[in-house]
């Protein structure tokens, strides 16, 4: 797995680490003008297309790859695991200066920290100006942050299923997720690496997340009120023998079980905080003012069934790009019942506008604009 060391990295909080390890993947060949940075979502990784050893398919294999919408025979694709995560880039579970895991002594991270980390990584790769930055969910916030902080370094921005900031409902749900982790006795104020991990709290937090990522329609279609047979529940439910176990519970148990095996609880807390804290307009009068220096093309892609980041929120981003003076702006709305997860699973709807936008900007044949229609 490729990594690089960034010397003397200073976080937004003011803390500096002597060296920051950043794990990343590249796909395709760099020609000098074809670099596309892909920003992963909350618990994603650098393996957008899959691991080099073929161990899994990655998190966006139907969008990134040879002959895919982000065609790796045409574009040089870069994806980096963000600071604070646990897929190879330094974060709470990584070894600190003394050789033990950082835990909660790792500096707090922000979305702008991710952006500056990516800029420095690209410098080491010899990439100056990006053809495009593409990101979904909090990765979409990361993409928008590029338009604010490095407007001259990117030609096109594709912000998918995202918003300039979280609303109160999402902030509240994230607070519940954090409390589930911190309320687990094994969390031990984040110092759990030598013993039992707070798997119960992390499982609950992830189950809440999966409910947030689906829509009412998709849950009704996928699960309804059907009952299921299960031997275990995660977390364990002492009252389970008195009640029927529903299909939706079985699904949540499975998702929690697989997630706690691959993710770190402290990293989850750090990344949630970064998403909670982000405000594209911070320190500026408005979102439009924050985006005013970006004069390239912007695609804002949203989904009708997404209540996590709604189409109406995306419309405000598109309006801000227009008011800021971007060369071309389109708000492409996908009619989908998949919920927030649509950007990951509905590749037939996501792929064509994304491919055409990368190729021709907002003039792309499959790119539509819902201005005034949301």
Swiss-Prot record:
Substrate binds at residues 206, 341. It is an enzyme of class 2 (transferase). Its main location: cytoplasm. Residues 34-346 form the AB hydrolase-1 domain. Pfam families: Abhydrolase_1. Belongs to the AB hydrolase superfamily. MetX family. The keyword Zinc-finger does not apply. One of its GO terms (cellular component) is cytoplasm. It catalyses: L-homoserine + acetyl-CoA = O-acetyl-L-homoserine + CoA. Its EC number is 2.3.1.31. Keywords: Acyltransferase, Amino-acid biosynthesis, Cytoplasm, Methionine biosynthesis, Transferase. Transfers an acetyl group from acetyl-CoA to L-homoserine, forming acetyl-L-homoserine. One of its GO terms (biological process) is methionine biosynthetic process. Pathway: Amino-acid biosynthesis; L-methionine biosynthesis via de novo pathway; O-acetyl-L-homoserine from L-homoserine: step 1/1. The active site is at 137 (nucleophile), 306, 340. InterPro entries: AB_hydrolase_1, AB_hydrolase_fold, HAT_MetX-like. This is Homoserine O-acetyltransferase. NCBIfam families: homoserO_Ac_trn, PRK00175.1. One of its GO terms (molecular function) is homoserine O-acetyltransferase activity.
């Amino acid at each position: 797995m490729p990594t690089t060391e960034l010397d003397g990295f200073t976080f937004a909080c003011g803390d500096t680490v002597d060296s920051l390890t950043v794990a990343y993947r590249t796909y395709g060949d760099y020609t000098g003008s074809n670099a596309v940075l892909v920003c992963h979502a909350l618990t994603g990784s650098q393996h957008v297309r899959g691991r080099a050893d073929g161990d899994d398919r990655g998190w966006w294999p139907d969008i990134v790859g040879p002959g895919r919408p982000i065609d790796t025979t045409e574009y040089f694709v870069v994806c980096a695991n963000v600071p604070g995560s646990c897929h190879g880039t330094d974060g709470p579970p990584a070894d600190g200066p003394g050789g033990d895991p950082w835990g909660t002594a790792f500096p707090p991270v922000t979305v702008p920290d991710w952006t500056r980390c990516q800029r420095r990584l690209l410098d080491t790769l010899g990439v100056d100006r990006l053809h495009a930055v593409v990101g979904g969910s909090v990765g979409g916030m990361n993409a928008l942050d590029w338009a604010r902080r490095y407007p001259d370094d990117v030609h096109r921005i594709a912000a998918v299923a995202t918003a300039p900031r979280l609303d109160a409902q999402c902030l509240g749900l994230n607070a519940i997720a954090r409390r589930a982790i911190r309320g687990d006795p094994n969390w031990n104020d984040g110092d759990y690496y030598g013993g039992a991990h707070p798997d119960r709290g992390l499982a609950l937090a992830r189950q809440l997340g999966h409910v947030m990522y689906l829509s009412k329609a998709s849950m009704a279609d996928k699960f309804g009120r059907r009952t299921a047979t299960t031997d275990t529940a995660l977390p364990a439910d002492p009252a389970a023998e008195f009640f029927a176990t529903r299909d939706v519970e079985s699904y949540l148990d499975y998702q929690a079980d697989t997630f706690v095996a691959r993710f770190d609880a402290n990293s989850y807390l750090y990344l949630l905080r970064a998403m909670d804290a982000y405000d594209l307009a911070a320190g500026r009068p408005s979102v439009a003012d924050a985006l005013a220096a970006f004069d390239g093309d912007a695609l804002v892609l949203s989904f009708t069934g997404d209540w996590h980041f709604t189409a109406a929120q995306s419309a405000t981003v598109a309006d801000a790009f227009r008011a800021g003076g971007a060369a071309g702006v389109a708000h492409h709305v996908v009619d989908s019942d998949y919920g927030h997860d649509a950007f990951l699973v509905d590749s037939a709807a996501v792929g064509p506008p994304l491919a055409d936008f990368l190729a021709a900007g907002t003039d792309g044949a499959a790119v539509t604009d819902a201005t005034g229609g949301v």
